UniProtKB/Swiss-Prot annotation:
Keywords: Cytoplasm, Nucleus
Subcellular location: Cytoplasm; Nucleus
Pfam families according to UniProt: Tub (PF01167)
UniProt record similarity statement: Belongs to the TUB family.
Predominant cellular place of this UniProt entry's protein: cytoplasm
Amino acid composition bias (Low complexity), ranges on this chain: 57-81
Domain of life: Eukaryota
Protein name listed in UniProt: Protein king tubby 2
Any single biological process term in GO: protein localization to cilium
Gene: king-tubby2
GO CC annotation: cilium; cytoplasm; nucleus
Disordered: annotated span: 49-169
SUPFAM superfamilies with a match to the protein in the record: Tubby C-terminal domain-like (SSF54518)
Length: 422
C-alpha cells in the first residue's frame, strides 16, 4: 500500500500545495518528510533559504507587490480643484468596488522605482501594495507647499517605521483618552474590523477600533456607523458599541461628508449653537477630484488644528460667525493654526506594474484604501498609516499630533464611496 501511495504521489497530474497559499495551523511534527513552514509575514518567508521565488540581484531590495494593475498611456499631472465652483461642475463617476480593491500578494523582485508624476503611469483605483523597502525615496513626495503649527515634526524620530518609538497604551478613562493628542515619541498600533453581518450591515456596516497590546490582546476604543437617514455620508462615532447615537453617553463625535464625497469634516460632540460647549473642528479630509477619469491611487489632504506649546489643540470653531473653520483657513491661506498633511506618494514599480509603499510589515494586502500621512517638513515621520490585512480587517497606526478619534475618523473617510474621485 505504501508503495502504491508513493507511486501515486509521484504522478505528474497530482496538484501539490503551494508555499504561497494561506498556511493553516498544523502540528509541529513533520509528516511524510514534508517541511512545515511557519508564516510570519512577507519578510519571514523571503528570508527562508528554500524560497522558490528567490532571485539574487545586485543590491535590489525585494518588494511585496500586487500584480494585475494595468497602465494607461496618458501622461498628466494631477490637480487639486478644491474650490466650490469647481466642485459644482463635477460629474459622478464610478464608486469603490470591494471586488477590485484587494489583490493577492505575490513575491516578486523589485526594479527601479519611479514617481508616478514623472513617469506618467496612472491607473484607475490602483491598489497600493505593501513594500519591504526601508528606503522610500523622498523625491517621490508631492511638491506641494504646506504649513502649520506642528512643532514636533522637526524634533521627532527620523525612523519612519517607528522601531525607536515606544508602543502606546490607554492612559486614563477611555472617553478622555480617545480625544487627547498622542504623546510624543509613542506609536499607537490599532486594528479596525468591519462587521457586515445582519440585515442592513451590508450597506451600513459597523466599524470597531481596537488598540493592539502585547501577546495578541486588544482593547476596544471606538465604534462607528453611517447614519441611515442622511442626505450625505454621516458617521456617528462612540465609545459605546451598543448605542451608536448622538444621545448616547459614549458619543465622541461625527464624520460628515459633502455631496460628492470629496471633503469630510470631523467634529467633536459639542453642539453647533451652544455657547457653553460649542462644536469644534477636529479635522478635514480632502480627496482630489478626478474630473477626467484618470486612473491612479487616491490623493488626500488632511487639515488638523495646530498645537500649542503644552501639546494641546488650538480650538477652532467653524460655526462661529466671528472665526474661520479649518477648511476656510486653508482656502484663505491662513495657516498659522492649521496643520496640513498629505498622503505619501506611492512609488510606481515599472516591472510589477503596481504602486508600492513601505508599511513595515503592518499591511499585507494591496488596496486603494492603503495610505500613509506625512508632513511636508518631515516626510520620514509617518503621522498615520492605514492598510488592509484581510477582507474586513485593517491596521491603523498613528502618532502625535493625532488622537485616536481623529485617526479613526480619517480611516472611516477612506471606506466611504466617492463619486467624483474615481
Amino acid at each position: 500500500m505504501e508503495a502504491y501511495i508513493r507511486q501515486k504521489r509521484a504522478t505528474p497530474g497530482m496538484v501539490q500545495a503551494s508555499d504561497l497559499q494561506l498556511v493553516r495551523p498544523m502540528s509541529a511534527v513533520n509528516r511524510n518528510g514534508r517541511e512545515v513552514h511557519a508564516y510570519d509575514g512577507p519578510m519571514q518567508f523571503m528570508m527562508s533559504p528554500s524560497n522558490p521565488d528567490q532571485i539574487i540581484s545586485s543590491g535590489s531590495p525585494t518588494t511585496v507587490t500586487a500584480t494585475g494593475t494595468t497602465t494607461g498611456s496618458v501622461t498628466t499631472t494631477p490637480t487639486s480643484p478644491y474650490s466650490d465652483a469647481t466642485l459644482e461642475k463635477l460629474t459622478p463617476s464610478s464608486q469603490d468596488s470591494e471586488d477590485e480593491e484587494s489583490t493577492p500578494v505575490d513575491i516578486l523582485p523589485s526594479s527601479n522605482s519611479f514617481d508616478r508624476h514623472s513617469d506618467g503611469h496612472l491607473t484607475h483605483s490602483a491598489p497600493i501594495s505593501p513594500a519591504l523597502n526601508n528606503n522610500v525615496s523622498r523625491d517621490s513626495q508631492q511638491d506641494s507647499g504646506s504649513s502649520g503649527n506642528l512643532k514636533s515634526m522637526e524634533h521627532s524620530s527620523p525612523q519612519a517605521s517607528g522601531h525607536n518609538d515606544a508602543e502606546g497604551d490607554v492612559a486614563g478613562p477611555i472617553e478622555q483618552w480617545v480625544t487627547q493628542p498622542a504623546a510624543q515619541g509613542v506609536l499607537y498600533k490599532c486594528r479596525i474590523t468591519r462587521d457586515r453581518k445582519g440585515m442592513d450591515r451590508g450597506l451600513f456596516p459597523i466599524y470597531y477600533l481596537h488598540l493592539e497590546r502585547d501577546y495578541g490582546k486588544r482593547l476596544f476604543c471606538l465604534a462607528g456607523r453611517k447614519r441611515k437617514k442622511s442626505k450625505t455620508s454621516n458617521y456617528i462615532i462612540s465609545c459605546d458599541p451598543t448605542d451608536l447615537s448622538r444621545q448616547a453617553d459614549g458619543f465622541v463625535g461625527k464624520l460628515r461628508s459633502n455631496v460628492f464625497g470629496t471633503t469630510f469634516f470631523v467634529y467633536d460632540n459639542g453642539k453647533k449653537d451652544d455657547p457653553v460647549s460649542p462644536r469644534l473642528d477636529l479635522a478635514v479630509v480632502i480627496y482630489d477630484t478626478n474630473i477626467l477619469g484618470f486612473k491612479g491611487p487616491r490623493n488626500m489632504t488632511v487639515l488638523l488644528p495646530g498645537m500649542t506649546e503644552d501639546d494641546q489643540r488650538v480650538k477652532i470653531n467653524s460655526s462661529d460667525s466671528h472665526g474661520q473653520g479649518l477648511l476656510d483657513s486653508w482656502k484663505s491661506k491662513h495657516m498659522d493654526n492649521v496643520v496640513e498633511l498629505h498622503n505619501k506618494t506611492p512609488i510606481w514599480n515599472d516591472e510589477t506594474q503596481s504602486y508600492v509603499l513601505n508599511f513595515h510589515g503592518r499591511v499585507t494586502q494591496a488596496s486603494v484604501k492603503n495610505f500613509q500621512l506625512v508632513h511636508d517638513s518631515d516626510p520620514d515621520y509617518i503621522v498615520m498609516q492605514f492598510g488592509r490585512t484581510s477582507d474586513d480587517i485593517f491596521t491603523m497606526d498613528f502618532r502625535y499630533p493625532l488622537c485616536a478619534f481623529q485617526a479613526f475618523a480619517i480611516a472611516l473617510s477612506s471606506f466611504d464611496g466617492k463619486l467624483a474621485c474615481e
